[in-house]
Amino acid sequence: MAAAILDGRALAAQRRQQLREQVEAIAPAVGRRPGLAVIMVGDNPASAVYVRNKERACEQTGIVSFGKHLPGDSSEAEIRALIEELNQDDRVDGILVQLPLPSHLDAVPLLLAIDPEKDADGLHPLNLGRLLRGEEGLRSCTPAGVMELLAANQIDPAGKKAVVIGRSILVGKPLAMMLLEANATVTIAHSRTPNLPEVCRQADIVVAAVGRPELVGADWIKPGAVVVDVGINRLEDGRLVGDVDYEAASAITSWITPVPGGVGPMTVAMLLHNTVLSYCRRSGQPFLS
């Protein structure tokens, strides 16, 4: 039985439309549209593509994008000064620093410099702490996008065993907290986990987020499990693949995300969601989406 597809592109388009309708409804009362500032340092080609995609998504949603492109040799102090300027700019509701940064820069102090109420990526320690405590806050975009995909397809994690392969602060750790919040029994697996395939075979939900092309084969997956592939890897032949062997896994899973077109579009959708949420909070308007 072929797996059903967790279609991130279609759901992201639906979410963009919902956000656009909300923006159009409240912008006249606020006197402006929401604003998202994207800081890019250097000329990484992949980052440039991601930034263009975000700017295009902003346009489709009615969000004003403020592109801030700095030279690759910019200092931490120069970037912090820009972040502080954006923190004080009332036109800006969300700020993100496009990663990765040039090797001479440390992302952590720059992410700490962002106003937590404008933390569009949901990576500030205050927002991660709110997640840990089960409080409202701006949530990490990729994990939140995964949870949206599950919810939109009536996949309830409650009572299920979930294995998250990967322990990064970007995906693995916050996603484990979100699944736990949804009443799943969660295991975080990683490179030091003994018998990793066997651990995965116990799971009703498997999330792969390690950045290793097609690491997870069909023999790692329990028949009927839900598989979410967060990885995106470019092979030498130019193909984009995830961390899961899609063709093999899709023959035995109940649901699976494609790569591309699964989690990636939802990451951008949640970035827009966080920006509009911040806009509503800062302007005293109800958030409906």
UniProtKB/Swiss-Prot annotation:
Any one GO molecular-function label of the UniProt entry: methylenetetrahydrofolate dehydrogenase (NADP+) activity
Presence of the UniProt keyword NADP in the record: yes
Source organism of this protein record: Synechococcus elongatus (strain ATCC 33912 / PCC 7942 / FACHB-805) (Anacystis nidulans R2)
InterPro entries (UniProt xref): Aminoacid_DH-like_N_sf, NAD(P)-bd_dom_sf, THF_DH/CycHdrlase, THF_DH/CycHdrlase_cat_dom, THF_DH/CycHdrlase_CS, THF_DH/CycHdrlase_NAD-bd_dom
EC number: 1.5.1.5, 3.5.4.9
Pfam families assigned to the protein according to its UniProt record, in alphabetical order: THF_DHG_CYH, THF_DHG_CYH_C
Keywords assigned by UniProt, alphabetized: Amino-acid biosynthesis, Histidine biosynthesis, Hydrolase, Methionine biosynthesis, Multifunctional enzyme, NADP, One-carbon metabolism, Oxidoreductase, Purine biosynthesis
Assembly mode: Homodimer.
Alphabetical GO biological process terms: L-histidine biosynthetic process; methionine biosynthetic process; purine nucleotide biosynthetic process; tetrahydrofolate interconversion
UniProt similarity note: Belongs to the tetrahydrofolate dehydrogenase/cyclohydrolase family.
Protein name: Bifunctional protein FolD
Domain of life: Bacteria
